[in-house]
Amino acid sequence: MTRFLFAIILGLLLTACQQETVEETEFVPHKLTELRVGTLYGPQIYMTSGQGNSGFDYDMAVLFAEYLDVPLKMVPYTNLAELYDALKKNEIDIIAAGMTETPARREHFRLGPPLYRVNQVLVYREGMPAPKDISDLKGKITVIADSSFVETLTQLQKRHPTLVWDQVTDKDNEELLTMIANKEIDYTIADSSSVQINRRYLPVLRSGLVLEEKLNVVWLLPPTHSDGLMSQLLAFWHQEKLAGTLDHLNEKYFGHVKRFDYIDTRAFLRAIETVLPRYRQHFETHAGDLDWRKLAATSYQESHWNPNARSPTGVRGMMMLTQPTAKEIGITNRLDAEESIRGGAAYLRDMINRLPESIPESQRMWFALASYNIGYAHVEDARKLAESMELNPNAWQDLKKVLPLLQKRKYYQKTRYGYARGSEAVHYVDSIRRYYDTLVWVDNQSKQQNSEEVAPSDLTAEETPVPAPGTLSPDKPK
């Protein structure tokens, strides 16, 4: 009842505030039999794979459908024009596609509350001169038709009349970034989050001029007759904001991609091609209920897939096991690649199982990896420290803030197990997450090339059914 009254109040307030753009209608709580969400494919928006669906917008859509207590139907489109047209024709209820707030969108749609913020940046290839001003461009800009980037360029053209650009309707943002990497086009414009994600696979991408700063990423609703859905969306957003869901999803999709190492990324991509094939079967065999790519990413962080690796502290092998750990899990030869992988998988699984049940499934791997790196006891110290600071001890985004404090006497003297190099654990986990994301991308590209199925670009408005509420949650493994 409280949620219902809150939704009505929000709806009435919203109607009063937007009378200049929205026709006045008597407010009626919005009733849906299913939530039809129009979207675009993209790693931070909506992706499907054998491991499940993912994406910031997708995860939020799942939660919103659960909040409304209706099934979710994701409806991907191939371009923005189709997406806008579908909303206009009432074929979808909402657009959730990583779209930024712009003057034109404010004029033609109702905008939901902010999910996260991005900058619009000029993107070019490594080796090209870095333009200091839009007038310094030594080539042509190519952008997606009907996108916010066209609006930005139109405004820039008023100050730079010679500025020209190409618009494409048959490409998406990821394809344009790939074309930059392949020297097929000179420049494009992209959201900073998209560049950060894609340079893990396309390390030659460079971010240049910041053309727009701190733009809100929002969902779009129809301009009229959407009071009910908008009020429910606002109530849902308020609930999830207070619950920390937005912070969690921000960390999940963007928290580990801000740090970038060009040389390391190039070396990792080469290792995937030349070294991984020798050991992939071992990772797949011994991963068990773990994703083999997470196990492989951990091994690369530990040893760069070198079975003879050793450190000054005495850890050795593909998974860099200590002698006591190897003995405990029944490994007799740490330099045998398969034995080391089997042992590392068993040890990592043990770390996951030791964690408190209060830690969500989607974050247990990151806590376990931190334990793998600095020890379970120090991670428990950090969790208790987080709780004393009124942070969430079960949220990785909060533990990331606390772990480096274990290096400061002011904090570690209060803990049971004392000093630990917590900042290294944060870097360790973030690196593995980046390696894992790259492995997933390469694996999906390989499967797509070998598949005889119709490519997504040849589809029109494919409807993807999603399990009913309660059967899937962002806190379940992807």
From Swiss-Prot:
Keyword Lyase applies: yes
Record has Membrane as a keyword: yes
Recorded GO MF terms: peptidoglycan lytic transglycosylase activity
Name of protein: Membrane-bound lytic murein transglycosylase F
Cell location: Cell outer membrane
Chain segments carrying region Disordered: 447-478
The record's note on its domains: The N-terminal domain does not have lytic activity and probably modulates enzymatic activity. The C-terminal domain is the catalytic active domain.
Positions annotated as active site in the UniProt record: E302
InterPro entries noted in UniProt: Lysozyme-like_dom_sf, MltF, Solute-binding_3/MltF_N, Transglycosylase_SLT_dom_1
Gene3D superfamilies per record: 1.10.530.10, Periplasmic binding protein-like II
Non-LT domain: annotated span: 23-257
UniProt-listed Enzyme Commission number(s): 4.2.2.n1
Keyword field: Cell outer membrane, Cell wall biogenesis/degradation, Lyase, Membrane, Signal
Annotated region (LT domain), positions in chain: 258-478
One matching Pfam family: SLT
Listed PANTHER family: MEMBRANE-BOUND LYTIC MUREIN TRANSGLYCOSYLASE F
Principal EC category: lyase
Similarity field: In the N-terminal section; belongs to the bacterial solute-binding protein 3 family.
Function: Murein-degrading enzyme that degrades murein glycan strands and insoluble, high-molecular weight murein sacculi, with the concomitant formation of a 1,6-anhydromuramoyl product. Lytic transglycosylases (LTs) play an integral role in the metabolism of the peptidoglycan (PG) sacculus. Their lytic action creates space within the PG sacculus to allow for its expansion as well as for the insertion of various structures such as secretion systems and flagella.
Annotated catalysed reactions: Exolytic cleavage of the (1->4)-beta-glycosidic linkage between N-acetylmuramic acid (MurNAc) and N-acetylglucosamine (GlcNAc) residues in peptidoglycan, from either the reducing or the non-reducing ends of the peptidoglycan chains, with concomitant formation of a 1,6-anhydrobond in the MurNAc residue
UniProt GO BP: cell wall macromolecule catabolic process; cell wall organization; peptidoglycan catabolic process
Gene Ontology CC: cell outer membrane
HAMAP family the record matches: MltF
Topology class, membrane: Peripheral membrane protein
Residues of the signal peptide: 1-22
